[in-house]
């Protein structure tokens, strides 16, 4: 499996699992209900987003007008949709760690003249990514993001590659209808993609791009035009990044009267174009939308998509209620026991054999305590406690932060009053609890990375935005 992941693109393999586990229906329903009544903070809490900003403080420091603009964006923020579209990494489809992503930019007056304030979301570093939490805050251009609450972040500056301020349809409920056009779903199908020789580019460069990964080459010209317009230019060169080492250049030429869409030519990147010399095409504009690719390949049904995504990509789709968490409560299992089929099911909140009387069960439990072989029914119950068939699903939900969904699966199988026995299931639940504690310590700025995770430069001065916390030290 590791060899396959290393030698091929793993996007088709992890995106179906991400769509099943990363943003559960209960999160979407709760966040949507709270957003509809104007409770943007409650919607963020339901979507696993920690709010690290205070609008009253913002009004005092930057004025009421700016605070009103930020509040308007927050009231229309769909945090569950934002989580749906966040950048993810292989092989498990977890959130890309250590990112600061700009959602919106605001012009404001600062102590040194006009400045730009950013509404950003941040993902924690990989060593503190328990629960796949996201933080929402403001960034004022300082190195450390000082002036706004929240834990110190390894990369406080908004990423040039991973940005959503030019893709508000991926988080703003007012503009979700734009997804169909911006993704190319309105005019492209799997059989209608242009051939490589129909796009002005070198066959070697374009052939590599189109074959290795599902790139949205057909949208690059329009998306590059949007990027250049945001930079105050009508034409120019844009860098397209495919990881740390693979880059291409888009040379965009605008039509003289603006009646026609911009033209572009793909060229190989050279060493002359440094990381800060040219604007970078946002990652959201580089690839084909994962949901669109899943629909085209038949890997997912429209019912499994986020409702706002499904309504944009499949306008004629009629949504139906289809819970994804299996409801196992009240179900009985069948076990081959002593030449007959016996039942096991929930009794008084615990999983128990249904075809054996209590006296027989007590004798069998005593036999097990004396190292005897238990009944097949008791063996099945013990296996369900230690390593159930649903373990993979429980693990996926825990990793993606769906604690409630994981516990619902466990309680549906073992009962709400079950006492877990030692085994893989209990280990997974305990590990998830430990990871949540680590994340809490990271949020409180009481925990640093483990030795070896961060390379420390002894000759580098401490950033001015950081200070020591004497109350966190221990006495000697």
Residues covered by each model-derived region:
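N-terminal accessory interaction module
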Residues: 99-148, 241-243, 251, 256-257, ...
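Extended alpha-helical solenoid scaffold regions that build the rod-like backbones
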Residues: 229-231, 243
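C-terminal structured domains
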Residues: 243-476
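Alpha-helix capping/helix-boundary segments
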Residues: 217, 223-226, 238-239
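N-terminal membrane-targeting/anchoring modules of bacterial envelope and secretion proteins
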Residues: 1-211, 216-218, 229, 413-476
């Amino acid at each position: 499996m590791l060899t396959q992941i290393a030698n091929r693109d793993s996007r088709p393999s992890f995106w179906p699992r991400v769509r099943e586990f990363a943003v559960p229906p209960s999160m979407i329903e709760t966040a949507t209900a709270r957003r509809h009544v104007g409770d943007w903070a409650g919607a963020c809490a339901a979507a696993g987003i920690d709010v690290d900003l205070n609008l009253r403080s913002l009004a005092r420091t930057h004025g009421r007008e700016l605070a009103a603009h930020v509040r308007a964006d927050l009231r229309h923020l769909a945090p569950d949709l934002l989580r749906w579209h966040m950048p993810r990494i292989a092989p498990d489809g977890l959130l890309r760690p250590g990112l600061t992503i700009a959602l919106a930019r605001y012009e404001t007056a600062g102590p040194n003249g006009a400045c730009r304030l950013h509404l950003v979301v941040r993902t924690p570093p990989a060593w503190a990514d328990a629960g796949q939490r996201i933080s929402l805050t403001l960034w004022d251009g300082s190195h450390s993001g000082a002036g706004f609450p929240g834990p110190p972040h390894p990369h406080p500056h908004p990423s040039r590659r991973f940005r959503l301020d030019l893709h508000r349809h991926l988080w703003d409920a007012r503009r979700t209808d734009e997804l169909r056009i911006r993704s190319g779903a309105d005019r492209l199908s799997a059989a209608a993609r242009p051939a490589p020789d129909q796009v002005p580019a070198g066959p070697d460069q374009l052939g590599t791009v189109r074959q290795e990964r599902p790139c949205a080459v057909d949208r690059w010209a329009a998306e590059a035009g949007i990027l250049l317009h945001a930079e105050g230019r009508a034409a120019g060169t844009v860098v397209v990044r495919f990881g740390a080492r693979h880059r291409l250049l888009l040379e965009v030429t605008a039509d003289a009267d603006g009646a026609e869409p911009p033209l572009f030519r793909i060229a190989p990147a050279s060493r002359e174009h440094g990381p800060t010399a040219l604007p970078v095409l946002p990652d959201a504009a580089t690839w084909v939308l994962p949901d669109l690719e899943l629909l085209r390949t038949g890997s997912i049904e429209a019912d499994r998509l986020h409702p706002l995504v499904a309504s944009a990509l499949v306008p004629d789709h009629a949504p139906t209620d289809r819970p994804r968490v299996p409801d196992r409560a009240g179900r009985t299992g069948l076990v081959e026991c002593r030449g007959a089929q016996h039942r096991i099911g929930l009794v008084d909140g615990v999983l128990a054999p249904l075809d054996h009387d209590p006296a027989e069960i007590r004798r069998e439990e005593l036999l097990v305590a004396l190292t005897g072989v238990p009944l097949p029914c008791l063996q099945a119950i013990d296996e369900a406690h230690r390593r159930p068939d649903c373990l993979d699903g429980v693990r996926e939900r825990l990793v993606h932060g769906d604690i409630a969904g994981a516990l619902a699966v466990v309680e549906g199988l073992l009962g709400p009053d079950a006492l877990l026995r030692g085994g893989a299931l209990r280990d997974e639940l305990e590990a998830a609890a430990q990871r949540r504690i680590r994340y809490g310590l990271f949020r409180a700025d009481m925990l640093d990375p483990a030795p070896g995770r961060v390379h420390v430069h002894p000759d580098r001065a401490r950033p001015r935005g950081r200070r020591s916390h004497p109350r966190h030290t221990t006495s000697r």
